[in-house]
Amino acid sequence: MKTEQPMRTHYCGEVKVADVGEAITVAGWVHRRRDHGGVIFVDLRDTTGLIQLVFNPEHQDLFSEAEKLRGEFVLSASGTIRNRPEGTINPELPTGEVELLVLSLVVLNTSATPPFHHNEHAHEDVRLKYRYLDLRRNEMANNLKVRHDIIRSLRNFLDKKDFIDIETPILTKATPEGARDYLVPSRTQKGDFFALPQSPQLFKQLLMMSGFDKYYQIARCFRDEDLRADRQPEFTQLDIEMSFVSEEGVLQTMESMIRNLFQEVLSDPLPDPFIRLSYEDAMARFGTDRPNLGVAMELVDVGDLMRQVEFNVFSGPANDKDSRVACLKLKNAKNITRKQIDDYTNFVGEFGAKGLAYIKVDDISTGADGLQSPILKFLDEKTIHSLIERLALANGDIVFFGADKISIVNASLGALRVKLAEDFDQMNSGWFPLWITDFPMFNWGEKEKRWMAEHHPFTAPKVTTTDELIQNPGEALSCAYDFVLNGHEIGGGSIRIHSQTMQEAVFEIIGIGSTEAEEKFGFLLEALKFGCPPHGGIAFGIDRLAMLMTGSKSIRDVIAFPKTQTANCLLTDAPSQPETDQLKELGLSVRAKK
């Protein structure tokens, strides 16, 4: 009986000097072919790396076959491992000291000329259209391997902590924010629609009510919204819920999990404990609830110094309780140009700021005479001295001011803070994890003219009675928390409402009356009657986490088959028009595009 030869005995990138003299078989793709003075060299690539194949002309048939090889041909090559000749060793390759003298070759498949080379920086649209070729690149393959390592580490940690993995439905009910739901028509109940879940939120709460103590799931979620570099219409999150737990209990467990993850996958230790900031403190100091603590600059309030100045741009907001006057100090900026300042003025304008006042420090020893600014003429000597003292100004500093509604100042200076750090190389390297806590329970929707849940309507308030909540919803804080890493919101969660009366009160405050509440959340309200335990949880964005841990610029680089920023799949050309018969069976018709 003839024994079939294996397609490979070794992986390309794992061949070592210790294998010299061994007869081996490798398989993979032609990465590059070179003809050097009658000897043909082929770099063969597989998932582990490269090995150099050598074809000598004395093996005429093999040499003729090698001459026909082209990029991305698929081969199985057998031969003997030998040391590379002196002067040809490649220290950049793990296999750079050895080569395979080929004695047998099987061409398993040919290839058309690829639309881009492995080392070429092709346009992203081309990469997405030919994603199966893009994923052959080391960078992309490594990204998906790291993603796998991330998920494996998270699973192992939670398994050891007695969490259990439970799947929740993909076909479910539309949410109150239904405009962002992907809808799926029901064939059996014409005119009715399922919605794809934006999160497993209610199902994981129901699992706690069912007596499961600790739950997790690597959940696929869907949201129909405008996309950014770190958003996709379908995304993956690590979903977690725990019973009989406090906010502190959730944060401590999750902090241990994240610290373990970075140690296992990247061998990077994270600080212990993570920094914690209240929402109010984060907004005041950084202008955002997801600050990058790798930037040392902070917003400094100077409104109290500006109430009496004869400069309405400052004094107006300084005397308005809904406004703010704050500033940023950039150090070592003596070479900043007028054009750069104009560019930063335009930049903050994108966030609603009407201008960007500044003071540049040339020689602090001469007081006001050592400062440059068009606004100095509006500020008296006492105010200038107070600014110098409060900001600890030094030569080469420049101070940028924001004076407007609180939201505009926070957004504009918060964004400018990061941009200045990037432009002036003042971004500290490393990992800067933190928790944001004590979020407002509600925010007032100017457009909607009603209170809206800051996180979601199932978040528990810090107050203990419905009367306190109803009397002053604008002052109520929630038991919500976000995990922020280097300026990115990676996770968010809360302690949940476990009282039916409190849940009904929250619905009422955000404009969901009893009829609508019963229609959309009747199953939840009913479940809350039957001994619901205190519970809480969190969800982490796997895509965004993988993006940061691989150093990628977009989550599209850590997803095997992502959508574009217009939610298209360039590989499969989805979404597409359905067949007429499909629509008919569903009882649907499509209006023609105008």
Model-derived features: positions:
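Class II aminoacyl-tRNA synthetase catalytic cores and aaRS-like
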Residues: 1-594
